[in-house]
Curated annotation (Swiss-Prot):
Keyword set, alphabetical order: Calcium, Glycoprotein, Glycosidase, Host cell membrane, Host membrane, Hydrolase, Membrane, Metal-binding, Signal-anchor, Transmembrane, Transmembrane helix, Virion
Cofactor binding notes: Binds 1 Ca(2+) ion.
Name of this chain's protein: Neuraminidase
Modulation of this protein's activity: Inhibited by the neuraminidase inhibitors zanamivir (Relenza) and oseltamivir (Tamiflu). These drugs interfere with the release of progeny virus from infected cells and are effective against all influenza strains. Resistance to neuraminidase inhibitors is quite rare.
Residues on Virion surface side: 36-102
Predominant location category: virion
Cellular component terms (Gene Ontology): host cell plasma membrane; membrane; virion membrane
Length: 102
């Protein structure tokens, strides 16, 4: 088997496994959706629901937007310094940086 046939065989097997995986996902989603619709008919939960109602207090938050701009000036501190971005962060050495991919 020559190298091209090996590459085509590996690609075909990979593509077949991907198709099988997608098919299994579709089947799993279908079974889940059908199972939820079948079992979702007004069942009572065994949970205890506690509701706290206070009829005397009503809290509302009203937010109104106006066409205003808020500009906040921040003073620059004298102690700030910035990195020199013209130099590399780490000095890489070796031949792998200049090699070809194939």
């Amino acid at each position: 088997m020559n190298p091209n046939q090996k590459i085509i065989t590996i690609g075909s097997v990979s593509l077949g496994l991907v198709c099988l995986d997608i098919l299994l996902h579709i089947i799993s989603i279908t079974i889940t959706v059908l199972g939820l619709h079948k079992n979702g008919k007004q069942r009572r939960c065994n949970e205890t629901v506690i509701r706290e109602d206070n009829e005397t207090v009503r809290i509302e938050k009203v937010t109104q937007w106006h066409n205003t701009n808020v500009i906040e000036y921040i003073e620059k501190l004298e102690g700030d310094h910035f990195m020199n971005n013209t130099e590399p962060l780490c000095h890489a050495k070796g031949f792998a940086l200049f090699s070809k991919d194939n």
